[in-house]
């Protein structure tokens, strides 16, 4: 397997949709949107389970304190957008009550530290980074807002699957097995190699996140589908059978 890094979701999705790459770890809503627009993609497994966090500056102690503030998410088509909407509802707020900006996850901790944003929702390790470095604190964990939430997924181009089903099945089996066997020590070694974070940040991050049971269940996907419709992210999400590789 050859790994290729992309600097933006747009570039990654263009490569995946066109078949320039065979598969990717991607925000699941982006892949759902592509399928709704006629692109042949299949989601095969989760990237991780739960534990996206809402990080806010120290002057914010309640969701209602976010009114009029600036909040960052990685993409409008993301579970982080869903979690933001779910959280705002707890304080009788709506998305119109705050200023939402899209930022690359790696830019979120420094933006919070500089005061250009007041909070963000993101996957690891960028939540732990702000906590460890003293830029902010956790207001909500995704499990508080949406149990068994789906965020990133391993997604294959349909053309690749048509021609390489046996190889894809072998890869997927090994991928899921790796998740079930992964302990914090091994995960930390891999994270140190690729993520460029300090040891304390990785220790905190790996306490929050887990990789066992990476199957995409029907119940969890149907809940996701309802939420993307509710919040205007995708009015016509693909069905489980059309989108989930089985």
Regions from the PLM with identified roles:
Residues 1-93, 100-102, 118-124, 135-139, ...:
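Short, glycine-/small- and polar/acidic-enriched structural segments
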Residues 10, 14, 18, 32, ...:
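Solvent-exposed, polar/charged alpha-helical surfaces in well-ordered, non-transmembrane soluble domains
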Residues 28-30, 101, 105-190:
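Pocket-lining segment of extracytoplasmic ligand-binding domains
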Residues 35, 89, 131, 192-193, ...:
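Short polybasic/polar patches that bind polyanions
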Residues 162-235:
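Secondary-structure end/capping motifs
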Residues 230, 236-246:
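Hinge/cleft segment of the Venus flytrap/periplasmic-binding protein
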């Amino acid at each position: 397997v050859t790994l290729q890094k992309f600097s933006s979701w747009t570039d990654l999705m263009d490569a995946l949709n066109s078949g320039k790459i065979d598969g990717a770890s991607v925000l699941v809503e982006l892949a759902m949107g592509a399928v709704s627009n006629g692109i042949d993609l299949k989601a095969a497994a989760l990237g991780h389970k739960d534990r996206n966090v809402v990080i806010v500056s120290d002057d914010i102690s309640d969701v209602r304190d976010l009114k009029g503030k600036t909040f960052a998410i990685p993409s409008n088509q993301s579970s982080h957008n869903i979690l933001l909407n779910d959280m705002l509802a707890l304080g009788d707020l709506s998305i119109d009550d705050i200023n939402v900006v899209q930022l690359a996850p790696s830019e979120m901790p420094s933006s919070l530290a500089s005061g250009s944003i007041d909070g963000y929702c993101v996957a690891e390790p960028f939540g732990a980074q702000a906590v460890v470095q003293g830029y902010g604190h956790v207001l909500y964990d995704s499990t508080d807002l949406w149990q068994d939430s789906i965020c990133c997924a391993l997604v294959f181009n349909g053309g690749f699957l048509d021609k390489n089903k046996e190889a894809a099945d072998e890869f997927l089996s090994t991928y899921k097995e790796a998740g079930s066997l992964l302990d914090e020590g091994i995960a930390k070694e891999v994270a140190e190699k690729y993520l460029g974070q300090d040891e304390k940040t990785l220790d905190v991050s790996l306490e929050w996140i887990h990789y066992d049971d990476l199957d995409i269940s029907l119940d969890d996907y149907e809940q996701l589908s309802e939420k993307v419709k509710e919040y205007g992210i995708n009015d016509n999400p693909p069905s489980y059978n059309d989108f989930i590789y089985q």
